[in-house]
Regions:
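Residue-level detector of conserved, well-ordered beta-strand and adjacent loop positions
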Residues: 14, 33, 63, 73-76, ...
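Short glycine/threonine/proline-enriched tight-turn/helix- or strand-capping micro-motif at secondary-structure
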Residues: 11-45, 72-73
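Acidic, glycine-rich catalytic/binding loops that coordinate metals and/or anionic ligands
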Residues: 1-12, 33, 68, 81-98, ...
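Short, solvent-exposed coil/turn segments
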Residues: 6-7, 25-27, 35, 55, ...
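A generic structural motif
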Residues: 17, 36, 52, 76-79, ...
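A structural signal for short beta-strand/turn segments enriched in small hydrophobics and glycine
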Residues: 13, 40-42, 46-48, 89-106
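Zn2+-dependent peptidoglycan hydrolase active-site motif and core
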Residues: 42-89, 109-119
Length: 188
């Protein structure tokens, strides 16, 4: 179901779908934990719409071409580097593996450790348990992902040193503009 795992960094998670939350609500997704600022990537090709929500803080919705909506919440910043939105930007297209934001703890998560709340809504309907899809999703370090680009991108992968692959991740080779944005954000 997911073409790529939503975080391009070491991540931990457990199944917390449908667990009780404050105000009598149920947890409609899963919390994925990683370092603050870890790159969040599009799990499929589709349209990205970012915004702000009292519970989710900085949020984005990815509307995949098959009608599935993927919801990401508590972002530290969006891919364009903005941390807050006064006027939501126009929707934009993203490819699977492209950076769409950075992990944080905004909204009602400001007193928690950094994480992304992630939901899957097939047909833009009710949320389903994302754990099975997350467990089977390829990670950025997976050879299937690293070889998924065009012939010229695959040639670059073959010639790049292992150190570069480990330090920047395979997505940096497939999405060099995103890699440069991350480098600017990290100040390296």
């Amino acid at each position: 179901m997911l073409r790529i795992f939503p975080i391009a960094a070491p991540t931990s998670f457990t199944s917390d779908f449908n667990e009780g939350r404050s105000g009598g609500r149920l947890h409609a997704g899963n919390d994925l934990f990683a370092e603050r600022g870890a790159p969040l990537v599009a799990v499929d090709d589709g349209q990205v719409r970012s915004g702000r929500d009292p519970l989710g803080g900085n949020i984005l919705n990815l509307y995949a071409n098959d009608g599935t909506r993927y919801y990401y919440a508590h972002l530290d910043a969006f891919a364009d580097g903005t941390a807050t939105l006064i006027d939501p930007p126009a929707p934009r297209m993203a490819r699977a593996g492209e950076i769409v934001g950075f992990l944080g703890n905004t909204g009602n998560a400001k007193t928690t450790v950094p994480h992304v709340h992630f939901e899957i809504h097939p047909g833009n309907g009710p949320a389903i348990d994302p754990v099975p899809a997350l467990q089977s999703a390829p990670r950025m370090s997976d050879p299937r992902v690293m070889l998924a680009g065009t012939a010229s991108q695959r040639n670059v992968l073959v010639t790049v040193s292992a150190v570069t692959l480990l330090s920047l991740g395979a997505w940096a080779l497939l999405y060099p503009n995103d890699a440069q944005a991350l480098i600017r954000r990290l100040g390296v």
